[in-house]
From Swiss-Prot:
The active site is at residues 161, 192, 346. GO terms for molecular function: serine-type endopeptidase activity. This is Subtilisin-like protease 7. Residues 1-20 form the signal peptide. One of its GO terms (biological process) is proteolysis. The gene is SUB7. Residues 21-119 form a propeptide. It comes from the Eukaryota. Belongs to the peptidase S8 family. It comes from Trichophyton rubrum (Athlete's foot fungus). PROSITE patterns: SUBTILASE, SUBTILASE_HIS, SUBTILASE_SER.
């Protein structure tokens, strides 16, 4: 997955069946990682049977390396065990080993792991932002953000991205480092994650100015990562939120790619775990039904609007879109201090995650049901939203 200030397609769609397990085939143009796979177990598999399967994989992998004396494969790398769903693992295996795994009756499907790359559409320093004013107003063109003084207090936002500059003055000590699944640098060396975090909970740029922010790094300095690493970040955020109170948590994923069943299943597991998840629709001006995790129906999928209340020309659209939010020329925090301007559905999505945190602070409940609340509060103003797409734009209900 890459973040949605422009993502290359990533996906595995059509399925072939080999001895019972689906090995999902890769679409043309997808940058797969050589000999790397994501294996997803059957629904409902017990922890005991999952442990037994992994032991079998590790034994067989070691035996194959000893017997062959050929190119070394790394074997199993990440293990996924969401509290409310997805169990599986990723790793580096040769074709024969993958075929052996596919014969197992306890395997649901296998995907090739894939890489994504994000690219900012536009960047400019120190330009006033309009997005906040639009969230707090019924009419366009305002310059004031109206909001309740609770401002998301007591809520926590998990930003699954490039990391966050937790020392930035925007966060006033409310940002913490959570986990890193991509490199050994616990910092935002790209800038995307800090911008997203600022829109959620920054004192100046944030929709929920008193919310806590947790950085979950899954993309590197170039905005690049893998589906397998992103799923690890999703699992970590789900477990941490459940330990601290899932009904007080929101998660933001300003990233994505072409359809991936594993990514969608992981997103569904976050929602099933009681966490409100906002996901970018994508920046390719196409139907988001072919994007992941945007196409997962149990989460909240966000398209980008302009200051003139029209669909941003880059924004994806379609029936899977739940709501529009400001995403064109949005000002927010940048690493090291100060601000920058970025555009994309990446920038629209944290307005919605921030609104979710804001509503939690107001006592409006939490969890995936927040998406319905946000849609009910939205105003019907988007011009030319796209085929079969909602024309609703988010609003915080301040009445202004």
């Amino acid at each position: 997955m890459g973040f949605i200030t422009k993502a290359i397609p990533l996906a595995l769609t059509a399925a072939s069946v080999i001895n019972g397990a689906e090995i999902l085939e890769t679409r043309a143009g997808v940058q797969t990682l050589a000999d790397k796979y994501i294996v997803v177990m059957n629904d409902g598999i017990s922890d005991k049977d999952f442990d037994s399967h992994r032991s079998w994989v590790n034994r067989n992998h070691r035996r194959r390396l000893i017997r062959r004396g050929a190119k070394a494969m790394g074997g199993m790398k990440h293990t996924y065990n969401f509290p409310t769903g997805l169990k599986g693992y990723s790793g580096h295996f040769d074709e024969q080993m993958i075929n052996e795994i596919s014969k197992r009756a306890d395997v649901k499907y296998i995907e090739r792991d894939a890489r994504v790359q994000i690219n900012a559409i536009e960047q400019q320093d120190n330009v006033p932002s309009w997005g906040l004013a639009r969230v707090g107003s019924k009419e366009p063109g305002g310059t004031t953000y109206y909001y309740d003084s609770t401002a998301g207090e007591g809520s926590t936002a998990y930003v699954i991205d490039t990391g966050t500059d937790i020392q930035h003055e925007e966060f006033e000590g409310r940002a913490t480092w959570g986990a890193n699944f991509v490199d050994d640098m616990d910092m935002d060396c790209n800038g995307h994650g800090t911008h997203v975090s600022g829109t959620i909970g920054g004192k100046t740029f944030g929709v929920a100015k008193k919310s806590n922010v947790v950085a979950v790094k899954v993309l590197d300095c170039n905005g690049s990562g893998s589906n397998s690493g992103v799923i690890m970040g999703m699992e970590w955020a789900t477990k941490d939120a459940q330990q601290k109170g899932a009904d007080k948590a929101v998660a933001n994923m300003s990233l994505g790619g072409a359809f991936s069943q594993a990514s969608n299943d992981a997103a569904a597991a976050i929602a099933k775990g009681g966490v409100f998840l906002a996901v970018a629709a994508g920046n390719d001006n196409v139907d988001a039904a072919d994007s992941s995790p945007a196409s997962e129906p149990s989460i909240c999928t966000i398209a980008a609007s302009t200051e003139q209340d029209s669909k941003a020309d880059f924004s994806n659209f379609g029936q899977v879109v739940d709501v529009y939010a400001p995403g064109d020329s949005i000002t927010s925090a940048k690493p090291g201090g100060g601000s920058q301007v970025l555009s994309g559905t990446s920038m629209a999505t944290p307005h919605v995650a921030g609104l979710g945190a804001y509503l939690i602070g107001l006592g409006k409940g939490g969890g995936p049901g927040l998406c319905d609340t946000i849609k009910q509060m939205a105003i019907d103003v988007i011009q030319n939203p796209g085929a079969s797409t909602t024309s609703k734009l988010i609003n915080n209900g301040s009445g202004m």
